[in-house]
Amino acid sequence: MTGIQALERIAPTKPMQPGQVERREFEYERHGTLSLIANFDVVSGQVVSPSLGPTRTEADFAVHIGRTIDLDPEGVWLFVVDQLNTHQSETLVRLVAERCGLAVELGEKGKSGVLRSMATRAAFLSDPTHRIQFVYLPKHTSWLNQVEMWFGILVRRVLKRGNFPSLEALHARILEFIEYFNKTAKPFRWTYTGRPLVS
């Protein structure tokens, strides 16, 4: 989940010429932001069920997860997420309980039961007996989350040198890139061998 600004350069970019580097205006006009919530399928290397919208609230994340689960309503789902509070929300707990057909008393947020705290909600969401399970990465390990690597690719290939005169242009360009990326997608291959680092 990430926020993306629709930035339009004030002056047009001047392309490279012999003996001259490309010249890009550093001043820009901001046309608003979009929030991208995406899933990265580690087996196929594809971006699955992306959601683009103006906000990234707990309701937005729960709707996104619901749409993703709708791709295979009876399937087993494993979501790797960071420690963000929207990934441990009451709305998400209620969605998982409903979709898994769990008839348990969830309690009241901030007071009792599963909904009492973020820790109790995270424990419920990460229960391996549920067919929809969340795995929470430890803090400061975003490099383990493969969707974060994909966000880096999106920044380098689309956003860094992009010029977006409107939110609609940004929205369309991101979806075009995802479609293009998925056509040639391959899973990321880890190259670190696991040897201890030496100083």
Residue positions per predicted region:
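Extended, low-complexity cationic-aromatic segments
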Residues: M1-G66, R195-V198
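Short catalytic/ligand-binding loop motif for oxyanion handling, primarily in non-cytosolic enzymes
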Residues: Q5-L7, T86-E90, W143-Q146, L197-S199
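Short secondary-structure boundary/capping segments
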Residues: A11-K14, V93-A97
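RNase H-like polynucleotidyl transferase catalytic core
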Residues: R23-Y28, R99-Q146, N163-F164
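A generic secondary-structure signal
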Residues: R67-L71
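Acidic/histidine-rich, metal-coordinating catalytic segments
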Residues: G75-H87, G110-S112
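C-terminal anion-handling pockets and recognition modules
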Residues: H130-Y136, H140-T141, E148-S199
